[in-house]
Amino acid sequence: MNIFNTNPFKAVSFVESAVKKALETSGYLIADCKYDGVRGNIVVDNVAEAAWLSRVSKFIPALEHLNGFDKRWQQLLNDDRCIFPDGFMLDGELMVKGVDFNTGSGLLRTKWVKRDNMGFHLTNVPTKLTPKGREVIDGKFEFHLDPKRLSVRLYAVMPIHIAESGEDYDVQNLLMPYHVEAMRSLLVEYFPEIEWLIAETYEVYDMDSLTELYEEKRAEGHEGLIVKDPQGIYKRGKKSGWWKLKPECEADGIIQGVNWGTEGLANEGKVIGFSVLLETGRLVDANNISRALMDEFTSNVKAHGEDFYNGWACQVNYMEATPDGSLRHPSFEKFRGTEDNPQEKM
């Protein structure tokens, strides 16, 4: 398969004036639950070859065994109920069932089987005992996530020629769920081992109802909402028409160095975060990490050197951007690279 830039629709930061305008025009808004997962694009071409890709069109390490030809994709494309028989792209959120976001995203980025992920691997791997009686893996094996552990929340589907073209898909947000459900019913039938779901979605008719729904979903443990203009279409890239309603904004960047705890305070001698060069060109200190991460990062730096994490791709969260472009309360959120290549954003 020819891998292309999938460039899915990415929600922009919440802008109340723009959202109110969409509400006035349509009389209501679509509000989808925002899931804490890894954005994924599943591309299936006309010869039934599939590619499981990240939002920046990189192969997802733990799902590489699902790439390539599968007779079931061929059967699905040939099914009279398939609305895109020449191929399609699915856009959604990938999650690992039964674990939190950090664990799940870590598993999806994982390249090799280790003791702590053996339970999620598709098959058993041989083990052996060390002279001290510790069980270790006997050899080196690529990590293949068991598809039964995989959950996919679908946002959109489009024909492959539109996906390849990079053009917007002229289907309104209010109609997209019907297209998604038409495909989801087939996915459930042909690939029952994977959990295929549609994003939990609501219609809200005023801003107060939107606020109430947001607070309700936050209380349930969700990240927030994706608010959609019902009459807007599926666009490519970060465009207005989908808005993120969540406590924090996010930015991607590259680690330039580590930040150490202040002398005389409790975190003295520990790595408390990173100096990160954002894609915008601004350098920020992204700290506010857990004690467990402090211990992990400090241990790695002491073992491998202070430049161990330099060049790693990461995500920084922040409350808002000021008019001069600086960020309020930036904090380290997660690494964006793969286990095999932490410097390449997935």
Curated annotation (Swiss-Prot):
Keywords carried by this UniProt record: ATP-binding, DNA damage, DNA recombination, DNA repair, DNA replication, Ligase, Metal-binding, Nucleotide-binding
EC number annotated for this UniProt entry: 6.5.1.1
Positions with a binding annotation for ATP: 32-35, 39, 55-57, 93, 142, 149, 238, 244
MF GO annotations: ATP binding; DNA ligase (ATP) activity; double-stranded DNA binding; metal ion binding
PROSITE patterns referenced in this protein's UniProt entry, alphabetically: DNA_LIGASE_A1, DNA_LIGASE_A2, DNA_LIGASE_A3
Family under the similarity heading: Belongs to the ATP-dependent DNA ligase family.
Name under which the protein is recorded: DNA ligase
Lineage: Viruses, Duplodnaviria, Heunggongvirae, Uroviricota, Caudoviricetes
